[in-house]
Structure formats: C-alpha cells, structure tokens
Amino acid sequence: MAISNVISVLLLLLVLINLSNQNIKGIDAFHQIYEELQSESVESVNHLHRPSFHFQPPKHWINDPNGPVYYKGLYHLFYQYNTKGAVWGNIIWAHSVSKDLVNWEALEPALSPSKWFDIGGTWSGSITIVPGKGPIILYTGVNQNETQLQNYAIPEDPSDPYLRKWIKPDDNPIAIPDYTMNGSAFRDPTTAWFSKDGHWRTVVGSKRKRRGIAYIYRSRDFKHWVKAKHPVHSKQSTGMWECPDFFPVSLTDFRNGLDLDYVGPNTKHVLKVSLDITRYEYYTLGKYDLKKDRYIPDGNTPDGWEGLRFDYGNFYASKTFFDYKKNRRILWGWANESDTVEDDILKGWAGLQVIPRTVLLDSSKKQLVFWPVEEIESLRGNYVRMNNHDIKMGQRIEVKGITPAQADVEVTFYVGSLEKAEIFDPSFTWKPLELCNIKGSNVRGGVGPFGLITLATPDLEEYTPVFFRVFNDTKTHKPKVLMCSDARPSSLKQDTGLLAKDRMYKPSFAGFVDVDMADGRISLRSLIDHSVVESFGALGKTVITSRVYPVKAVKENAHLYVFNNGTQTVTIESLNAWNMDRPLQMNDGAL
C-alpha cells in the first residue's frame, strides 16, 4: 500500500510538472498556452502538408468556426484566429465571405479585444438574423478578472452584404454568471431562436464541478436576457460543455433542414456539446419542452462520453447554421493539427475547417447523417472509375490516373455472404476505438478489413487506411460494422520529446456504422487533401477526420489503393475518383 501511495504521488507530481512546463494556467486550461510562442512571427509558410481545398487563412493559427450565416447573397464565416503566430493566442474574430462555400475572400477582422467586457478575449459565439435589426453577434468576452461574459455586436451598416464593420455597444455585457455559476466556465452562446411565447432564446455552455451544463437565456428585445430557472440539460461526469448547438430536425422530411424557430409536431431536437476534457463531441436526439425549457434525450443512445458523434476523428468546436438559399442545415467544424508545436511554428500555420457538411436526420430516425456540400464537387478534375472488380484476401489494387494526395474518392463495396464474419464481443459495444486498435487493417478477419489505403508509399512504409470490418452480433442477430481511420502507420517521423507538444499525435479513430447490410453493400467516400483525410461511411452515417503528416508519401509520391485483408472476397462494385483542384480564391484579402 505504501509503495502504491508513493507511486501515485510521483505520478501526480509528473502531471503537475508537465502542466507547468506547458504554461497552462487558470481559465485558459482548455487551450494550451505558450506565452513565449503565441506572438512569434511567421517568416514564411511551408506548403508540404498544407491542404489545397480546405478553408484556411494564408498563415497562423485558426480554431473554432464562429457565426456562420447566409446573408444578402453571401455565406459568412467568422473564426477564432491568431493574428501573430501559429499557436493559440491573440485571438480575434476573423471574417471571410463566399458566394459558393468553395472560394473565400478574407475581410477585415470583425471583433478583437478592446473594451472592459472583452479585453481579455473575444471568444466563440454565433450570429442571429433579427427581423428589423439584421444580423447580431452573440459572443463570449473575457474581462480583466478572467470572468467570462456574454456580449453582443451589431453591424455598422446592416445593408452592406459584406458586413465589414461591427460595433460593440457600451451596454454590454448582456449576461453575466451569477453566484451559482462558474465564471471561468461560461461561454459560446448559440444562434438564438424566436419562440411563440414572444421570447428569444439562446443556449450557453458551462459546468459545475464535473457536471456539464447548458443554460438557456431568454429575451424579448435581444438586449435584456434572463437565465431560465433550470438548465435546459446537464450531465454528470462530462466536464465543461463548450460550443453547444441546439436545433430541430424533421421526422418526415429527410431532404431539407429546418430553421431554429420551426414549430411542428413531426420534429426532434438535437443537442450537441463539445467536451473540453476529451476534445471530442457528442450529441443526443430528444424532445424539447418549450414551457419548461427542458430538453429530454430519447435514451436510445448514451448521453455522455459514449454518445453519438458528428465526427469520430479530429473534429471539434463544430457549429451549424440554416442556409436559407438551399433550405439546408450546414455544419462547420475545426480540425486541429496533430504534429508538434515546433512543426506548427516552422510551417507557419495550424488548423483548418473541414469541408462544410449538410445535416439531416437519417430515415431510421435514430441518428443524423452528414455529407459534403454539393458545391465542393465543382473542384473535381480528372476522373477515373473501376467497376465489378474482385479483391481477394491480401490483395490491394492501386487507383491510378488521379493525384492521390488531393482527391475525392467514392467506392461501393459488395461483400455478399456474411457467414465468415467474426463473432462480436459485446464488451466492445460502446468501445469502437479500442476494437480498432486491436483489429487494425493488417489483422486478418473474416469479412474485412477492407477499404482504402490513402497517402501511401508503394511498400507501405507509410499509409493511412480507412476501412470497414464486419462482425456477427449474436445478441441482435445483425451485422456489427466497425469503421476505422488509422493514423498510426501514417508517418515515419519519430518524435522523442517528453511533453505532448513535442510528439506527433498519430491515433486511430473509429465508430460503428448502423447498417443492416441486407443487400451486402456498403459505401465509403474519402476527401484527401495532403494532411487531412475526411471519410464518410454508409452515405454519412459515420464520419471520421484524420490529420496525418507523411515523410515520403507526399505530393506526387503519394499513392492510393483499395484493399482487402479478410478471407471473404470483396467486390468493388463501383469506384469513382477525381483530382481535386484548388479553389480560385482561398482567403486572399485583408488578413
């Protein structure tokens, strides 16, 4: 017992030393603060691993997407941005606009710390279009005492489609934490919605000890806000709820999105939260009671760590908005870097936004489905296809005729019989990641693993596989389909640093895919862009984003394969692949 206690104390000291070395402090603990690095100027930008068709500023650090909105013919995206360096710090609201969600023009920054209610930071928030007033920003400001406050900003000229200049009125803040709340964990107001009782409502994330909390605030005039008596929802042991999102989905229309203020009987609500502790997100489907201002999850999936996710990979701080132009709900999300802090500084940039995705309720009514917006297909170039090609155990077939490091690949697999599927161990029911770590792409199975090998060298010294493995769930008598995106073999680079910031993060990511495979088919789409691989299983039922940094499998030296390591022969029923061109404009302008 004494030895055990000594070991525990030593481990605690190591953790504290590690935190101290990383300069993580106070309320900023949810971001790693490198005071000596956050203003280190960028002399040049290294393009070796830089994506070509994903949203990025020309240089420096980017994180949360903020305030996406469609207004007067333009898509607007604001985002957290470091004006001076490639690590987190000096954060402002940068601002870009687009006509097509593909080509982006950078404008002047919208918000930066300047007044007592945000002098310590202008953090994440949303935009609401208020009838008679135009767009209004709700955002989190940090005062000099490091207390988080909710503020608003208005456009100087609401008639300007570009919304170039914003004003922070002196009657801010509009919401402050009361004595029952944690003032250092009170942030990220959602887009507000107008209810039939005459009130506007917004949701703000928080925590009390280890309980994650979403508070609702109400207002009649969008200036004076009052906290509801009870949280709209909370959950023990989930920690701080960052970047909450709350929106309705239709139970009958599986093609169109709904605006926030839609009222109708055939709807469910979605509550998504970003978990500060894990840097993962999860969501539930449920019922929102307007009179009580309470949200009640259905209970069909876990409400907590093991819940459903928008994306099972490197994806965080996501934010949706309703696109009035095409009657759809669109999702943005941040994919951070996975290499070292030193590498980020040397290359002069860090972070990107994933390709925007449409959000719909699946026809099963049990989960959401996500798909890249159709506009991204305008970047498709050279095209190759493959049909009705069998892949036997141990085979891999190269996809030639495109640029594998910058591509869009869609493939439908036919597996036929599932008799050879391995028996599913029920202890992994809520542990897809652990199962993927054990059953990697090189571990032979019955039905699978099969899928794509992306960003690979010919000898597979480096590669990032995205694949399925089908199990037989004897409890449900249905197939259990595992989807993995495994970055462990993605790079030959060896990091020996003692601290996390000095080591490349090369994880596997995984999620189960809810398909019955009655017709023996399953689809996979991967968007490959140098250091990011976004993959969509079964038409978007399961999505995984990986960040990878090959040493050899870069640019024209990267290869793409289809593979099968299962004893069951798998057929490539159809494969369509395209080069992806660069957008004509990617944030050229004010930044």
Swiss-Prot record:
Note whether Signal occurs among the keywords.
yes
Q: Tissue-wise, where is it found?
A: Expressed in flowers, and seeds, and, to a lower extent, in seedlings.
Instruction: Report the InterPro entries cross-referenced here.
Output: ConA-like_dom_sf, Fructan_Metab_Enzymes, Glyco_hydro_32, Glyco_hydro_32_AS, Glyco_hydro_32_C, Glyco_hydro_32_N, Glyco_hydro_beta-prop_sf
Q: Which residues are glycosylated?
A: 145, 182, 336, 472, 565
UniProt binding sites for substrate: 61-64, 80, 88, 123-124, 187-188, 242, 276
Q: What class of enzyme is it?
A: hydrolase
Its annotated compartments are: Secreted, Extracellular space, Apoplast; Secreted, Cell wall
- What is the designated name of this protein? Beta-fructofuranosidase, insoluble isoenzyme CWINV4
Provide the gene name from the record: CWINV4
